[in-house]
């Protein structure tokens, strides 16, 4: 479709005719620390393009919290030892860098650790506040060979990526205040692979499988969403025409030529008895009502399972339809179609 945008002629077929992924499927084995996601179908080559872009953004640009400085009572610098402590201060600092935090504020936070004991001191001994949570309390900080006092104060900040100690801004550089190299990224690992996907009888499409491992301060689903938003914002500067206007023109054209299969009754689809009964129980009588539902909504329907969903999806694919379609004024158009049908049959 060609549309006019000022003095520019826009060919919307450049993107409108590309196959688009229907949804992002989350693997049932996913949890708060690990997520596996499947995106299909994609045009050939798009799996690698999108997968690699998301991976790079996830690893480099996600905001997270980390300790940026620590003050250890009685210690003037990190190149020393503490009597009664098995580790030297350099090793203690390395252990502190391994502590992961979740923060609910952009303001710097200060946490304290105070113990009087013998044995292992861990991140669980840090006194949390309402804005900061320790995500790996089992992380060892130091080992005390005798009963003794140990006190530390940590400065926690938000940031992204890896920041060397000499690159931190606004930190007090004084004796006893040890500034740390900080790894803010909440993403521990990202992996992706690309497989073949089928659309109708065609198999030359991509299926993107991406796995995300986090420290728990952000869910894998949110991390994927944030990285996609970053890419979208960064790429928007390259678009030199009115997106909204072109989308409205496309919508007008599609309204004039609705897929006639949308007006078919559910009984005409020759579905299994179970699938048909589930649709009728959900008050879905025609295909146009069905395709406006999302797959997630359908799976919440009583007695409607994955097997029925796959069966219906195959039927919709054969009619070049899919779940989650937006059909403006469909009820009105359905009534107009019924009137034309009655008139033609009279």
Curated annotation (Swiss-Prot):
Residues 1-242 are annotated as: Alpha N-terminal domain (alpha-NTD). It is an enzyme of class 2 (transferase). It catalyses: RNA(n) + a ribonucleoside 5'-triphosphate = RNA(n+1) + diphosphate. Residues 258-346 are annotated as: Alpha C-terminal domain (alpha-CTD). GO terms for cellular component: cytoplasm; DNA-directed RNA polymerase complex. Keywords: DNA-directed RNA polymerase, Nucleotidyltransferase, Transcription, Transferase. Gene3D superfamilies: 5' to 3' exonuclease, C-terminal subdomain, DNA-directed RNA polymerase, insert domain, RNA polymerase, RBP11-like subunit. DNA-dependent RNA polymerase catalyzes the transcription of DNA into RNA using the four ribonucleoside triphosphates as substrates. Belongs to the RNA polymerase alpha chain family. Homodimer. The RNAP catalytic core consists of 2 alpha, 1 beta, 1 beta' and 1 omega subunit. When a sigma factor is associated with the core the holoenzyme is formed, which can initiate transcription. This is DNA-directed RNA polymerase subunit alpha.
């Amino acid at each position: 479709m060609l549309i006019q945008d000022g003095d520019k002629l826009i060919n919307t077929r450049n993107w409108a005719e590309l196959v688009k992924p229907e949804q992002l499927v989350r693997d049932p084995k996913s949890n708060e620390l690990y997520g596996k996601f499947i995106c299909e179908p994609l045009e050939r080559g798009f799996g690698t393009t999108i997968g690699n872009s998301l991976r790079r953004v996830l690893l480099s640009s996600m905001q997270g919290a980390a300790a940026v400085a620590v003050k250890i009572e009685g210690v003037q610098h990190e190149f020393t030892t503490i009597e009664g402590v098995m580790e030297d201060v350099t090793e203690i600092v390395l252990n502190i860098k391994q502590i992961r935090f979740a923060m609910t504020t952009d303001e710097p936070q200060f946490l304290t650790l105070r113990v009087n004991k013998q044995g292992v001191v861990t991140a669980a001994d840090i006194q949390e506040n309402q804005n900061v949570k320790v995500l790996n309390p089992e992380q060892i900080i130091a080992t005390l060979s005798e009963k003794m006092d140990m006190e530390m104060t940590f400065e926690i900040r938000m940031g992204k990526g890896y920041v060397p100690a000499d690159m931190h801004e606004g930190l007090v550089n004084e004796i006893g205040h040890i500034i740390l190299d900080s790894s803010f990224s909440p993403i521990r690992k990202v992996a992706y692979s690309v497989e073949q996907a089928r659309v109708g009888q065609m198999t030359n499409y991509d299926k993107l499988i991406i796995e995300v491992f986090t420290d728990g301060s952000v869910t894998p689903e949110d991390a994927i969403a944030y990285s996609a938003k970053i890419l979208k914002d960064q790429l928007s500067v390259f678009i030199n025409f009115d997106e909204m206007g072109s989308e409205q023109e496309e919508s007008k054209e599609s309204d004039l030529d609705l897929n006639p299969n949308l007006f078919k009754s559910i009984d005409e689809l020759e579905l299994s008895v179970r699938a048909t009964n589930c649709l009728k129980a959900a008050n879905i009588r025609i295909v146009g009502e069905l395709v406006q539902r999302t797959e997630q909504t359908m799976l919440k329907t009583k007695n409607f399972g994955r097997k029925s969903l796959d069966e219906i999806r195959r039927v919709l694919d054969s009619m070049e339809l899919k779940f989650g379609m937006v059909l403006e004024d469909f009820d009105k158009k359905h009534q107009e179609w019924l009137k034309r049908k009655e008139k033609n049959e009279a």
